[in-house]
Amino acid sequence: MFSESPIKRRKSTRINVGNVPIGDGAPIAVQSMTNTDTMDVGATVAQIQAIQDAGADIVRVSVPTMDAAEAFKSIKEQVTIPLVADIHFDYRIALKVAKYGVDCLRINPGNIGSEERIRAVVDAAREHNIPIRIGVNGGSLERDLQEKYGEPSPEALLESAMRHVNILRRLDFDQFKISVKASDVFLAVGAYRLLAKEIDQPLHLGITEAGGMRSGSVKSAVGLGMLLAEGIGDTLRVSLAADPVQEIKVGFDILKSLRIRSRGINFIACPSCSRQEFDVVSTMNQLEERLEDIIEPVSVSVIGCVVNGPGEALVSDIGLAGASRRSGLYINGERQKARIDNNNIVEQLEGYVRDFIAKKQNQTPIDIKIVE
């Protein structure tokens, strides 16, 4: 049972990255970035497809050389998800991939070069109807801003962003989004808050170089969660030193927790204690693995005893309240006469979830045998 989020989103303009709308109330897009060698076309295509299968809306690909630009052309021809080309230092690479059907160009103000070079990139983007992302990063600010501020600060990131926003404005180009990422949560959040007050272009959120799977997920959840709860953000990436597929899962989990966008199962599970009537931890691990393919938004509560089990089940699509030998089953908040054998919880609960979704989609329900 999913209710609407109370969050009032910041108003922003609309751009399109391929067929994905960004800003102006569009669903917050979740994206990741490949970590393969772009020159290895087969490996990169395979990873893009895996990221897409995980639910990504957009994938970014690093294009560091002209040879990589040629590889990008082949990659683009083999995938269907919108691709963003990540461009640093050599603006001519952006001009090349623009001809190859890229869906968005990411440029870094800290290293892309002079206004003349930016003008060339804008001209190519305009010619091919491609949006641009101005990607400011606390680790690669322009040298003069480093000297002015001494160290990265929200004001420094804002000045870098606005410097290039104003260039695009002078060039009468408004098809762009902006990010002001940093590895420090407060630095990034402060910069995004300042930027959100200055412009109405879509904002791409991220805590850059957040860390490994655990620490990076926590840091991203805190930082992105603060901004999203304030209505700031139109697209996001969770940056992890991990499999990019995990970035998509964590990204959707963050949106799901704020009731902004739901995909797949929202599990509600107790941490377990001596009152548990079945092994909650093992049950959850198995259910998460077996139901990973589900994309339909469904809330499932798995509580090991009757203290909180019935209450959580009342607000879940499917709920399990632990009891001796056979646990209570709830569907749409209503307790069922049938009960679930504690020795076979995973198989039976999986069946109920799939049956629930089949009925919701008007498909043939699965026949589940339940111990009465």
UniProtKB/Swiss-Prot annotation:
PANTHER family: 4-HYDROXY-3-METHYLBUT-2-EN-1-YL DIPHOSPHATE SYNTHASE (PTHR30454), 4-HYDROXY-3-METHYLBUT-2-EN-1-YL DIPHOSPHATE SYNTHASE (FERREDOXIN), CHLOROPLASTIC (PTHR30454:SF0)
EC number: 1.17.7.3
Name listed for the protein in its UniProt record: 4-hydroxy-3-methylbut-2-en-1-yl diphosphate synthase (flavodoxin)
Family classification: Belongs to the IspG family.
Organism: Pseudoalteromonas translucida (strain TAC 125)
Role summary: Converts 2C-methyl-D-erythritol 2,4-cyclodiphosphate (ME-2,4cPP) into 1-hydroxy-2-methyl-2-(E)-butenyl 4-diphosphate.
Keyword Iron attributed: yes
Reactions accelerated catalytically: (2E)-4-hydroxy-3-methylbut-2-enyl diphosphate + oxidized [flavodoxin] + H2O + 2 H(+) = 2-C-methyl-D-erythritol 2,4-cyclic diphosphate + reduced [flavodoxin]
Pathway: Isoprenoid biosynthesis; isopentenyl diphosphate biosynthesis via DXP pathway; isopentenyl diphosphate from 1-deoxy-D-xylulose 5-phosphate: step 5/6
InterPro entries: Dihydropteroate_synth-like_sf, IspG_bac, IspG_bac-typ, NO2/SO3_Rdtase_4Fe4S_sf
Cofactor: [4Fe-4S] cluster
UniProt-recorded Gene Ontology molecular function terms: 4 iron, 4 sulfur cluster binding; 4-hydroxy-3-methylbut-2-en-1-yl diphosphate synthase activity (ferredoxin); 4-hydroxy-3-methylbut-2-enyl-diphosphate synthase activity (flavodoxin); iron ion binding
Chain positions recorded as [4Fe-4S] cluster binding sites: 270, 273, 305, 312
Pfam families assigned: GcpE
Keyword terms, alphabetized: 4Fe-4S, Iron, Iron-sulfur, Isoprene biosynthesis, Metal-binding, Oxidoreductase
Note describing how the cofactor binds: Binds 1 [4Fe-4S] cluster.
NCBIfam families: ispG_gcpE, PRK00366.1
Membrane is among the record's keywords: no
GO biological process: isopentenyl diphosphate biosynthetic process, methylerythritol 4-phosphate pathway; terpenoid biosynthetic process
Taxonomy of the source species: Bacteria, Pseudomonadati, Pseudomonadota, Gammaproteobacteria, Alteromonadales
